[in-house]
Amino acid sequence: MNRSSLATTSLLACLLAVAGEAHAAGPVAAGATCPDASQAARIASAYAGATAPMPFMAAAKLGLPEVVVAGGLPAALGHGVDGKAFQAVWQSLGAWPDAVVMIRKGANIFEIRTRVPTGKPSTRSKLFNLDHDAALSGHLRPDLFTAIHAIQAPGAEGFMRGVFFYDDSGESVLGVFVPPAEAPPAAQVAAFDKTLALLKTLPPRCPRPAG
C-alpha cells in the first residue's frame, strides 16, 4: 500500500472512531430489546405464514424495534446471542466460501457479494479492522454491537440463511447471508450450519419463544 493510501486509511479510521464515540442517538432501552408477552404473540403471528419476512420488514409492519422482532423469532427460525460474541461469530463467517453482505442506511439497502473478510482489533482504538483481501473491507465497532441473531426461514424470494448484527439503535448494522439460490451449494449451507451451531452453544439473548 502506498503512502497516500495509508494516509487515507488512517484518516478514515480516525473519523470512524470519532463517529463511533459519538454514537448515542435514539438508543433502545437496555431492558426493552426482548419482546414482552404481548409483543411475542404479535411477532409469532407475523411469522406464522408459509414465508417469513426479514426482521426489519416485520418490524416496520408491527411498529417495533427490529432487535425486538429478532428476539421474538420462533426458535425454529433462529437464535440470538449477546453482541459480545462478535469475534467468535465473525471468525466463523470468515470461513464461509461466499456471502452477500447487506447494509441498510435509512431506506436504502446495499448488497455486496463477497467473501467475508477476517480482521483484528486495532491496537490504537476500539475499531475492528477488516482485512483488504476481499471485495468488502472497512472498520467495525463491535463494542457497540448489542445483539447477534441468526435466521433461517423460507422467504418470499427463496430460503434465507443469514446473521444480523445489531447496535443500541435497535436496528441491524449489517447482515451476512448465504447467496440466494434455488439450490445453494452444499458447502455454503454447511458453512451457515456451522455458524448457527456456534451460536446455539451460547446462551440465548432472549427467552426462547415456542415454535
Predicted feature locations:
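Bacterial N-terminal signal peptides that target proteins for export
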Residues: 1-10
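Bacterial N-terminal signal peptides
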Residues: 9-18
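Eukaryotic intrinsically disordered, low-complexity regulatory linkers and tails enriched in Ser/Thr/Pro
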Residues: 23-211
